[in-house]
């Protein structure tokens, strides 16, 4: 813990810094997001529509054979690194995957306000490969301010 006045949440072996407004309702919402599963499962066309309406945040979605798949487990482990700031979604349904143009064990990365996703190359992936890709592509972009992350800041890249 290196910042005075910061709030840190310990979850398992992870330390998560809270970068939001110090208001009771915001803190409770943040903590509730942390206790949810790191990956939200999409099983229906209605859930696909809800997924598509999330346009102002980074999100990832993958298509996997089952929850027991080693590739899904790697995806789930990677999601824990970014929870609750980046939303991870998965489907095991072929119809949903077809609607989203996903292939088996493929993960799509959506930037805020972008229509088309970036397909993470070289599938299937390990947890480390997914984490590395997200960190590399996670960048300051136009996005809606939310109380739970309104004070998040990025380091300037002085080397261009």
Curated annotation (Swiss-Prot):
GO MF, one example: calcium ion binding
Biological-process GO terms, alphabetical: regulation of cardiac muscle contraction by regulation of the release of sequestered calcium ion
Localisation per UniProt entry: Sarcoplasmic reticulum lumen
InterPro entries: Calsequestrin (IPR001393), Calsequestrin_middle_dom (IPR041858), Thioredoxin-like_sf (IPR036249)
A GO cellular-component term linked to this record: Z disc
Keywords associated with the record: Calcium, Metal-binding, Muscle protein, Phosphoprotein, Sarcoplasmic reticulum
PTM summary: Phosphorylation in the C-terminus, probably by CK2, moderately increases calcium buffering capacity.
Task performed by this protein: Calsequestrin is a high-capacity, moderate affinity, calcium-binding protein and thus acts as an internal calcium store in muscle. Calcium ions are bound by clusters of acidic residues at the protein surface, especially at the interface between subunits. Can bind around 60 Ca(2+) ions. Regulates the release of lumenal Ca(2+) via the calcium release channel RYR2; this plays an important role in triggering muscle contraction. Plays a role in excitation-contraction coupling in the heart and in regulating the rate of heart beats.
Family: Belongs to the calsequestrin family.
Binding partners and assembly: Monomer, homodimer and homooligomer. Mostly monomeric in the absence of calcium. Forms higher oligomers in a calcium-dependent manner. Dimers associate to form tetramers, that then form linear homomer chains. Interacts with ASPH and TRDN.
PANTHER family per UniProt: CALSEQUESTRIN (PTHR10033), CALSEQUESTRIN-2 (PTHR10033:SF15)
Protein name stated in the entry: Calsequestrin-2
Gene: CASQ2
């Amino acid at each position: 813990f290196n910042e005075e006045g910061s709030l840190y949440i310990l979850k398992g072996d992870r330390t998560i810094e809270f970068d939001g407004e110090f208001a009771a309702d915001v803190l409770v919402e943040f903590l509730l997001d942390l206790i949810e599963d790191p990956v939200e499962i999409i099983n229906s066309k209605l859930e696909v529509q809800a997924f598509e309406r999330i346009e102002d945040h980074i999100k990832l979605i993958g298509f996997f054979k089952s929850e027991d798949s080693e590739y899904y487990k790697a995806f789930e482990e990677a999601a824990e690194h970014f929870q609750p700031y980046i939303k991870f979604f998965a489907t095991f349904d072929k119809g949903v995957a077809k609607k989203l143009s996903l292939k088996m064990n493929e993960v799509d990365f959506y930037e805020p306000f972008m229509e088309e996703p970036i397909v993470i190359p070289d599938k299937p992936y390990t947890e480390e490969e997914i984490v590395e890709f997200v960190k590399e592509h996670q960048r300051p972009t136009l996005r809606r301010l939310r109380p739970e992350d309104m004070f998040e800041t990025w380091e300037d890249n002085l080397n261009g």
